[in-house]
Amino acid sequence: AKNYPTVSGSDHLRQVFXMGLSDQALLSDPVFRPLVEKXFFDDYAXRSGFEG
């Protein structure tokens, strides 16, 4: 089973997506960056329907 972020972490991700930040900004985000490094983003994007 994969480890998903806490509720607060998920809320933060939704806020970041909503802001429409660039990939550079996302990668520099202290909360988002660890998820990118864990390959979590692809799964999150698919579940949320988010497309870069």
UniProtKB/Swiss-Prot annotation:
Domain of life: Eukaryota
General remark: On the 2D-gel the determined pI of this unknown protein is: 6.0, its MW is: 27.2 kDa.
Protein name: Unknown protein from spot 415 of 2D-PAGE of etiolated coleoptile
Organism of derivation: Zea mays
